[in-house]
């Protein structure tokens, strides 16, 4: 009887599907998919198309913004404001994703990105990253734009409180050319 109960207790976490995330390497397939998705989102942003960004944003940011509709409205308004201010994207490039980090039942990795842009005729280089997040055991990634985290690193922990300790953000910034 005791062995039966012990086996049941050991099997219970598996039945509940509460597998915690483990830090590790990004597979070549995941790396290619991440780069492709980030490139597609950056391309949409450059064209003024916000729908892919809105659809692929991690729920934690939508919640922080006041919900899905509030986030969608803010994203559309931001893209319009940037265009009105004379910001145009010349080119974008998604880099090779780094390792993964545990975040409770999710895993996280950073995807570097570099953009050349023009701000009222002044060329600039933006170096930043996207934070890719997915539930362990799934293939669909959701994203957070890391640009806001460069000036506010605490935002990462606010959005992903279960993220393993000691994770440092990639470097980034703006540079006039």
Where are these regions (language model features)?
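Short, low-complexity N-terminal intrinsically disordered segments enriched in polar/charged residues
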Residues: 19-43, 47
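Bacterial N-terminal signal peptides
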Residues: 7-17
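Compositionally biased, proline/threonine/alanine/serine-rich low-complexity intrinsically disordered stretches
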Residues: 17-29, 73, 167-177
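Exposed beta-sheet edge and beta->alpha loop/turn motif
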Residues: 97-177
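Positively charged n-region of N-terminal signal peptides that target proteins for export
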Residues: 1-4
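Short solvent-exposed beta->alpha transition segments
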Residues: 29, 35, 51-108
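Alpha-helix boundary/capping and short turn/kink residues
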Residues: 47-50, 120
């Amino acid at each position: 009887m005791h062995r039966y109960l012990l086996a049941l207790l050991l099997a219970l976490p598996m039945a509940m599907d509460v597998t915690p995330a483990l830090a590790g390497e990004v597979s070549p397939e995941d790396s290619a998919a991440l780069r492709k998705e980030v490139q597609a989102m950056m391309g949409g942003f450059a064209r003024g198309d916000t729908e892919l960004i809105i659809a692929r944003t991690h729920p934690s940011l939508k919640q922080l913004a006041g919900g899905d509709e509030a986030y969608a409205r803010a994203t559309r308004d931001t893209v319009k404001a940037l265009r009105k201010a004379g910001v145009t994207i010349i080119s974008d490039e998604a880099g090779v994703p780094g390792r993964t980090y545990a975040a409770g039942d999710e895993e996280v990795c950073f995807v570097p990105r570099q953009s050349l842009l023009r701000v009222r005729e002044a060329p600039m280089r933006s170096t930043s990253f996207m934070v890719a997040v997915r539930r362990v055991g799934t293939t669909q990634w959701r994203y957070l734009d890391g640009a806001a985290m460069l000036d506010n690193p605490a935002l990462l922990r606010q959005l992903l409180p279960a993220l393993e300790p000691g994770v440092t953000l990639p470097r980034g910034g703006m540079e006039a050319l």
